[in-house]
Swiss-Prot record:
GO MF entries: ATP binding; dethiobiotin synthase activity; magnesium ion binding
Species of the source: Mycolicibacterium gilvum (strain PYR-GCK)
Compartments where found: Cytoplasm
Self-association and partners: Homodimer.
CDD domains: DTBS (cd03109)
Protein name per the record: ATP-dependent dethiobiotin synthetase BioD
Source taxonomy: Bacteria, Bacillati, Actinomycetota, Actinomycetes, Mycobacteriales
Amino acid sequence: MSILVVTGTGTGIGKTVVTAALACHARLAGLDVAVCKPIQTGTRDGDDDLAVVARLAGVEDLHSLAKFPEPLAPLAAAHRAGADLPSRAALDDLIAAVDRPGRLTLVEGAGGLLVEIGRGGVTLRDLAEDLRAPVLTVVAPGLGTLNHTVLTLEALAHRDVRSEGLVIGSWPAQPGVAEIDNRDALARLGPVRAALPAGAGTLSGTDFERLSVQAFDEAWVRGLVG
């Protein structure tokens, strides 16, 4: 399987735009690519992450298992909708069914790595462990990011889940001392695969394609496909 799980050090960190950029790069490189977002919340306000991926990346093979209207953590959003979260088996089966030989399957989580997304406390880390998939972590550039990043990487290492590196989800146009120093420090924690500029999600299709091609190393992206 060629599954890459995309998580973040928090909510609103840029996971969806990073997922879209990586999917766009893979598509333009001629790779077969699919995107899964097993759990989505906040859809009542038109916040559909897979629709964002489709618009930005031009990828049509998109999959989700459960959508809840309120912009809350998955468990709270499910309960307020009178529903349960999916089972661990259902989440695993969704992703396994999408993946196939020669395909890059991107799986975007909801919130951070250890947020409950399945019944019984199942997290994105559990799914990565089940599927033997590496994890790409989207991080912030500002103050606090080093602690959050280390906690996420340690949580992965605790379960022997391989880290595929880091992506800075929103790099400011005028970075300050903290951001510049943090970028160097993040690179010591793991390979920084890309740093997407702030506002990347507002770009037009052509501009987003150009950004996606430039943002990631093509050899690394191709190497994700086993």
